[in-house]
Design a protein with these regions (language model features):
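C-terminal substrate-recognition "lid" of short-chain dehydrogenase/reductases
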Residues: 2, 80, 118, 224-253, ...
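Canonical Rossmann dinucleotide-binding motif of NAD(H)/NADP(H)-dependent dehydrogenases/reductases
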Residues: 3-33
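Short, small/polar-rich loop/turn modules that mediate ligand/substrate recognition or access, typified
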Residues: 87, 173, 178, 246-248
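Substrate-binding pocket helix/loop in short-chain dehydrogenase/reductase
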Residues: 97-98, 102-110, 216
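Active-site helix of classical SDR
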Residues: 121, 157, 165
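Alpha-helical segment proximal to the catalytic Tyr-Lys
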Residues: 126, 170-174, 244
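Residue(s) in the substrate-gating loop at a strand-loop-helix junction
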Residues: 141
């Protein structure tokens, strides 16, 4: 198994890509800290993992809180006696415009895309160094590679994630720690459907909900949205020893949108 005996944390693991990743990693032998703000969703993922013979620790956390962003690392490491990887998957789409932006929403976008990953990374580095190395994975986006007129503030934040990953990779490589990002395009998740159904998205592009879902999910050469499992597969590779010389990349998983 590709993550046999590895101990890791997955944030926003209650649904979509995070859920798919946590379940897949456990099937590949990882011991997984399953993190989400939704207690029922955490319990569901842990149950699914354990039903299939895997091991998981459910952690309910609000990652807008600095203490929780640190606690998810220390709690997982204490429970499983170590830490080998973190997938910082949590994010927030933010406002659809740059005009009349509510600054509370702007702050939340930065908190859930940037601030929390800094705090979690800080805590994780101590644990990874104690293990002699490890892997840090971050969810950016194609919006952090090419920008998106649908979500300019989100693009701002995700460009920040990509920049952080590239700089971090150079800084921690000496400690046998790799840092990479996965950059999903439109993926058919609950978050995508909630996002495109928002009134600010519909007014921005002048489409009703169903047309907008098709537009956001059907663009690109492959003509369909991705599946959460397809992103989880890429994440698995980047976290595994198969990617032992892969460091500092931002890997698109987008069906060719950024080709």
């Amino acid at each position: 198994m590709r993550l046999e005996g590895k101990i890791g944390v997955v944030t926003a693991a209650g649904s979509g890509m995070g859920r798919a990743g946590a379940i897949r990693f456990a099937k590949e032998g990882a011991l997984v800290g399953v993190v989400d703000v939704d207690e029922d969703a955490v319990a569901s993922v842990v149950n699914e993992i354990e039903k299939n013979g895997g091991k998981a620790k459910g952690i309910v956390a609000d990652l807008t809180k600095d203490a929780d962003s640190k606690r998810i690392v220390t709690e997982t490491a204490k429970y499983f006696n170590g830490l080998d990887f973190v997938w910082n998957h949590v994010g927030y789409p933010g406002p659809a415009s740059v005009e009349g932006v509510e600054m509370n929403d702007f702050d939340l976008t930065l908190d859930l895309n940037l601030r929390t990953i800094l705090i979690t990374t800080d805590a994780a580095l101590t644990e990874l160094r104690a293990r002699g190395g490890g892997s840090l994975l971050f969810t950016a986006s194609t919006s952090g590679l090419a920008g998106s007129g649908f979500s300019p503030i989100y693009s701002m934040a995700k460009f920040g994630v990509v920049g952080f990953v590239r700089a971090l990779a150079k800084r921690v490589a000496k400690d046998n720690i790799r840092a990479n990002a996965v950059c999903p395009g439109p993926i058919d998740t609950p978050m995508l459907r909630v996002f495109v159904a928002r009134p600010d998205q519909q007014s921005t592009v002048g489409m009703d909900k169903e047309d907008l879902v098709k537009k956001r999910g059907g663009v690109g050469p492959m003509g369909r949205p991705g599946r959460p499992e397809e992103v989880a597969n890429a994440a698995l590779f980047l976290l595994s020893d198969e990617a032992s010389f892969v460091n500092g990349i931002a890997m698109p998983v987008d069906g060719g949108i950024t080709a």
